[in-house]
Regions:
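Mg2+-dependent prenyl diphosphate-binding active-site environment of isoprenoid biosynthetic enzymes
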Residues: 1-165, 174-184
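Short cytosolic juxtamembrane segments of multi-pass membrane proteins
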Residues: 186-188
């Protein structure tokens, strides 16, 4: 796990380095991109979500609390990735940007729900991390809250809602649809 933390730190600094290089975008957009990534990875995002997760080991959480926690974890980074894409497209309207943000929020939450499901269903070799670790550590999960089948169904519903949101974009949203399919089908 220590190696994973160091790799994550290194990749994060590379992301900031990449965003700080000249791109041809207006400086205001690049600054907005840097701010978006900083918020998504800091205490208002991934780090904050992890802190909530660790603070609630052994405690019951309701669905609203779980959604808040999960929206701050990988969900925040997925939303940031989509936001960075929108910031690089000056032709998008505010309504389109909001739609894409809603897509990303649903996708990010579905990713976390699937992560909880995989922790119960997959084996350690497939997962690439210790299977059952969340359960063993008595962490709050969607599987613990609603059961395995209901958690999987909830994730599939979130994905369907996310894909429906981007339908108006047609072929321009092909990669976003493929990303949603990947999240649903992933095994690790």
């Amino acid at each position: 796990e220590a190696t994973a933390f160091w790799v994550g730190d290194a990749l994060q600094t590379q992301a900031f380095d990449g965003l700080s290089r000249p791109t041809g975008l207006p400086a205001e957009r690049q600054l907005a991109m840097l701010s978006t990534l900083a918020q998504a990875s800091g205490s208002l995002g991934m780090a904050g979500g992890q802190a909530i997760d660790l603070a609630n080991v052994g405690k019951a959480m309701n669905q609203a609390e779980l959604e808040q926690m999960h929206s701050l974890k990988t969900g925040a980074l997925i939303r940031a990735a989509v936001a960075l894409g929108t910031l690089s497209c000056p032709d998008l309207t505010p309504a389109q940007i909001q739609t894409l943000d809603h897509y990303a929020a649903k996708l990010g939450l579905a990713f976390q729900v699937i992560d909880d499901v995989l922790d119960c269903e997959a084996d350690t070799a497939t997962l690439g991390k210790t299977a059952g670790k969340d359960s063993d550590n008595d962490k709050p999960t969607y599987v613990k809250l609603m059961g395995l089948h209901a958690a999987r169904t909830y994730a599939e519903t979130l994905i369907a809602e996310a894909v429906a949101l981007i339908e108006p974009f047609g072929d321009k949203a092909l990669r976003l649809r493929q990303l949603a399919e990947f999240v649903t089908a992933r095994k690790n």
